[in-house]
Regions:
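Cleavable N-terminal signal peptides
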Residues: 5-6, 16
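N-terminal signal peptide c-region/cleavage motif recognized by signal peptidases
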Residues: 11-15
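Short, low-complexity N-terminal intrinsically disordered segments enriched in polar/charged residues
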Residues: 17-39, 47
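Compositionally biased, proline/threonine/alanine/serine-rich low-complexity intrinsically disordered stretches
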Residues: 18-24, 65, 87, 140-143
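Short solvent-exposed beta->alpha transition segments
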Residues: 42-91
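Exposed beta-sheet edge and beta->alpha loop/turn motif
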Residues: 85-143
Length: 143
């Protein structure tokens, strides 16, 4: 009985590590962000930013207004870079190409990356903190 309990304790951290979000989850978060924007679900898109949207640098109203002239948008998210770690925090960069069509028909193409952030499991009481969230964006227009 004691052996089974000891083995369960040893296996528990391994199981927790297996459930941690990985690089593909970060890429999926960027794709989910643009899917939400495309369907006009700006509340969900805003919520994918770190700190409940605050990391976007905008209020929700300003964030939503920023897409007022956008008819369509899509993202091509490439393979994320290496995960960086520090003090129970994780960061990862996802390279992207973003394509937008404005309501006036003008097309835009941006290239750059999103940096995503998460907290390792067990550090925050809020389980949502362990999922990837957008932390910053570096996008430049492609001519």
């Amino acid at each position: 009985m004691r052996l089974a309990f000891a083995l369960a304790l040893i296996a528990a951290p391994t199981a927790a590590l297996a459930q941690e979000p990985g690089p593909q989850d970060a890429r999926d978060t960027v794709q989910a962000y643009y899917a939400a924007i495309e369907r006009g679900d700006f509340r969900t898109a805003y919520g994918l930013w770190d700190r409940g949207g605050q990391a976007s640098g905008k209020s929700f109203a300003s964030f939503r207004q920023g897409f007022a002239s956008t008819a369509h948008s899509r993202v091509e998210a490439r393979n994320p870079g290496r995960e960086d770690a520090g003090m129970s925090q994780r960061w990862i960069t996802v390279p992207v190409d973003v394509y937008a069509t404005l309501k006036n028909g003008k097309r835009q193409h941006f290239r750059g990356s999103y940096t995503l952030h998460r907290v390792v499991p067990g550090v925050s009481a809020n389980r949502a903190d362990t999922r990837w969230h957008l932390s910053s964006a570096k996008l430049v227009a492609v001519r």
